[in-house]
Amino acid sequence: MSSEPFKNVYLLPQTNQLLGLYTIIRDKKTKRPDFVFYSDRIIRLLVEEGLNHLPVTPNTVETDTNQSFDGVSFLGKICGVSIVRAGESMEQGLRDCCRSVRIGKILIQRDEETALPKLFYEKLPDDIADRFVFLLDPMLATGGSAIMATEVLIKRGVKPERIFFLNLICSKEGIENYHAKFPTIKIVTGALDKGLDANRYLIPGLGDFGDRYYCI
């Protein structure tokens, strides 16, 4: 179900297990091995939820007991596109769920002169326009990088309805900015934070995800 009051935002069920995982990764005292382990658990949950939104077609198979089972098969192929570098942390979670999945990368950094996001690099599957795309970035703060990455995908022929944006934490401002540009794209997230601080970090947040995950 879409998370009110945001249309096309799908929040993971706020179970005690999930809240416990977020408590660990938000804690500034958590060491890197634990931060990586528990972040990976959340990422896996996000990927599984993203897969729930892919279209399917009926498929009946025969079991080893010579009985019929009415199931489904996914329609179309998928790929992941990570926003480098933090988004690369989510690639393994996608690979764990989807064997031999194609992965693309987009590098966006802040222009020091304008303070605006700037595209530096992209490497995407040649047939990306024919695939469903999981856009991967752990944090949605202002939405600038995600908006630019999505513009790259659309310019490469990907239809907005085939894009699913997966992240661990969103801000209200980031959601509003992103959906002002792309209202039909589904966002799958695990947490909605209350806002941004003066440095444009999510609050309560967890700091710089990439630094904590890669220990740089």
Curated annotation (Swiss-Prot):
Keyword Nucleotide-binding: yes
Example GO biological process: UMP salvage
Keywords tagged on the record: Allosteric enzyme, Glycosyltransferase, GTP-binding, Nucleotide-binding, Transferase
Pathway membership: Pyrimidine metabolism; UMP biosynthesis via salvage pathway; UMP from uracil: step 1/1
Cofactor annotation comment: Binds 1 Mg(2+) ion per subunit. The magnesium is bound as Mg-PRPP.
Sequence positions that bind GTP: 32, 41, 75-78, 102, 131
Top-level lineage group: Eukaryota
Regulation acting on activity, per entry: Allosterically activated by GTP.
The protein's role, per its UniProt record: Catalyzes the conversion of uracil and 5-phospho-alpha-D-ribose 1-diphosphate (PRPP) to UMP and diphosphate.
The protein's name: Uracil phosphoribosyltransferase
Source species of the chain: Lachancea kluyveri
